[in-house]
Curated annotation (Swiss-Prot):
Full protein name: UPF0212 protein rrnAC1165
Family according to the record: Belongs to the UPF0212 family.
PANTHER family found in the cross-reference section: UPF0212 PROTEIN MJ0068, UPF0212 PROTEIN TK1194
Biased composition (Acidic residues): 106-157
Signal sequence interval, chain numbering: none
Start and end residues of each stretch annotated as Disordered: 105-157
HAMAP family membership: UPF0212 (MF_01223)
InterPro entries found in the cross-reference section: UPF0212
UniProt xrefs under Pfam families: DUF555
Length: 157
């Protein structure tokens, strides 16, 4: 079974003036810590909501030129037995590179394995049907398609 795991990270950012700047720096900082080892981890801004009214808040909390930014880190974990196993693997892999940054698993979604195979089969059958529908063309048309535009003038002469 393959799973898509979304982990929330609370990234501290220092000496910032605005929430937008804090988010940009947090994404950059997290990307530097994860790459090149985990370049398959997707980094997104986190969604925060007010616990009382449900209003959407910015992903960065800013106070005294310091910020705490909520980021969502998404990765796919392959060949796992259970959802909990996928969550542990994702937390371990990401947590090893993001030292002293708290992580919380937000979502675990099982990825259906059959959809990849059927998509490939459908696309290959669609290509073969398109090839069958094309009428046979002249040999001269094939030759002109193979020639680069820079050399067409030389052939015409």
């Amino acid at each position: 079974m393959n799973c898509r795991v979304v982990v929330e990270a609370a990234v501290p950012v220092y000496d910032v003036a605005s929430a937008d700047e804090a988010v940009r720096i947090a994404i950059s900082k997290t990307g530097e810590m994860l790459n090149p080892d985990l370049n398959y981890v997707e980094i997104n801004m986190g969604d925060r909501h007010c616990p009382h009214c449900g209003e959407t808040l910015e992903p960065a909390f800013l106070a005294a030129d310091e910020s705490l930014v909520a980021l969502e880190l998404e990765m796919t974990v392959f060949n796992v037995e259970r959802d909990e196993h996928a969550a542990r693997i994702a937390r371990k892999e990401i947590g090893q590179r993001l030292e002293n940054i708290p992580l919380d698993v937000l979502e675990i979604e099982e990825i259906p394995e059959e959809s990849d195979e059927t998509t490939e089969d459908e696309s290959s059958s669609a290509e073969s049907e398109a090839d069958a529908d094309d009428p046979p063309s002249d040999q001269s048309a094939d030759e002109s398609d193979d020639v680069l535009p820079e050399f067409e003038e030389l052939i015409d002469e």
